[in-house]
Amino acid sequence: MKVKICGITDVETAKHACEYGADAIGFVFAESKRKITPGLAKEIIGEIPVHVFKVGVFVNESVEVIQKIAEECGLTHVQLHGDEDNHQIRRLNIPSIKAVGVALEKDIECAKKYDTDYLLFDSPKEKFHGGNGKTFSWELLAHMPNELREKTILAGGLNILNIEEAIRTVQPYMIDVSSGVETEGKKDLKKIKQFIKKAKECSK
């Protein structure tokens, strides 16, 4: 099971997460308490292994700005968490992840229209897009066709206590965590290590 740690804002946490087995590190460039500058993201990316996905999270940003930041920082993927459509997705010259809020089964059907490399299924949008620590009904994803499952990233309120059930129910390509590995709003290295270990064990 691949694991993405999102909302990283410092070199030490990023390096430790990779040492613990993280497959992807997420940098939030949209409005959020975890927002990061391109300069700091570039510094962190320069310190983590080449094979790890470096994902930039954007919300309703222009293609031009996304591409500029991606090139400046060395991002390998961009995650689109707003109302982006296929016209915008196809203009990107970098692999993409389209986030979709799931409340009903029809949300999954609608997600199939996106011409993207990966689909990230998350809890429905609130004030901030993603990172709100709330789960949704994983059963809605339990019967996906394999071709969709193979490009699915599961997010939304995941933590050490519920990832076993989440992985067993959805069997996604990757799981994504942010607030579930934080203590008082800050990334907790102990929680990151435990989360990654548990996720890898669950998928054996």
UniProtKB/Swiss-Prot annotation:
Gene Ontology MF term list: phosphoribosylanthranilate isomerase activity
Keywords linked to the UniProt accession: Amino-acid biosynthesis, Aromatic amino acid biosynthesis, Isomerase, Tryptophan biosynthesis
CDD domains: PRAI (cd00405)
Catalysed reaction, written as an equation: N-(5-phospho-beta-D-ribosyl)anthranilate = 1-(2-carboxyphenylamino)-1-deoxy-D-ribulose 5-phosphate
SUPFAM superfamilies linked to this entry: Ribulose-phoshate binding barrel
NCBIfam families assigned to the protein according to its UniProt record, in alphabetical order: PRK01222.1-3
Protein name: N-(5'-phosphoribosyl)anthranilate isomerase
Biological source species: Bacillus mycoides (strain KBAB4) (Bacillus weihenstephanensis)
Gene symbol of the encoding locus: trpF
